[in-house]
Amino acid sequence: MKPWERFLEKYAAFGMAPSVERYVDLFDVDATLLHPGMKSPIGRDQVAQFIERALKRLPAFRFIPIHWNFRGDTIFVEARNSAEVNGKPIAWPSIYRIVLREDRVLHGRAFYDRTEVLAQFDPSRASSGVNAHSRLLDGAVPGGASGSDRDISAELHDRFVKPYAENWKKPDPDRFADFYRPQARMINPGFERPLGTAELPQYYRLLIADTPGLSLRLERWAGSPSLLFCEWTATGQMGGRPKTLSLVDRFTLDGFQAVEGVAYFDRLELLAMADPAAARIGDVSDSSAALPR
């Protein structure tokens, strides 16, 4: 068994029966961890406190890896998370990007939208409409996963990753549709419904108009014939000031084109760029966290 496979086995075991001890054991002595809402990464000495608070605040928490890919020293894991709040079951999707040292986490970062989770502690803050993104892994079964030592990296890079990343350096809205199959769909956090391929050019025109100077820089990626993860740093102007946002895209592929593209980022981080009150909201383990009124 390869180191990343040993890690994934332990990660999945934690998800089935979460405990502070099992979680801490996933981390290297030099590890760092960053979740949405954290001001900066925490070290291994703070990991136990984080997960203890999170498990207390989110009873019956479970974590099921659905899709994954490994490349170099990095594994991406897309997972369905579930818990209970005041006796009510909740679920939300996430992507965890993990740089490994052997079979332990050296640098871990979580990508998900805190909005729906934190709104469970204050129902008046829930989304007014349907959030299609929050339910996208409902009913998903582990095994559509890809573990990715198959050597298609060069062709995948040349036919999809490189040209897609190049288009984000100076975005051409019409070009984005070329990376999708005609009947594909794209989902971002907060979308009430998926967008079809034909709708993508107009969506990106509006996004670029609202965010002057918008561009994305590729940080890491891992892929296989049917699955691709890309981590990005987005930069652009909001309110006349430069802003940055980290995010991950997951693409389901068919012949080097996407049949589904899903973005993972934190909408509260976007809100905090315009609303100082939102910047004070903590991570999901923070019992003082509340959405701004």
Question: Can you describe what each PLM-predicted range is?
Answer:
Residues P3, Q46, L156, E199, ...:
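Soluble or luminal CAZymes and related metallo-dependent hydrolases
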Residues L8-Y11, F27, I51, A79-N81, ...:
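Hydrophobic alpha-helical core bundles mediating ligand binding, dimerization, or RNAP-core interactions
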Residues K10, L34-G37, V85, G147, ...:
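A general structural-boundary detector
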Residues L55-I152, R205-R293:
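A beta-strand edge to alpha-helix "cap/lid" segment located at domain peripheries
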Residues R6, A13, V20-D73, P173-S226:
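A solvent-exposed, acidic/Ser-Thr-rich amphipathic alpha-helical stretch
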Residues M1-L26, P142-F179:
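Short acidic-aromatic low-complexity motifs
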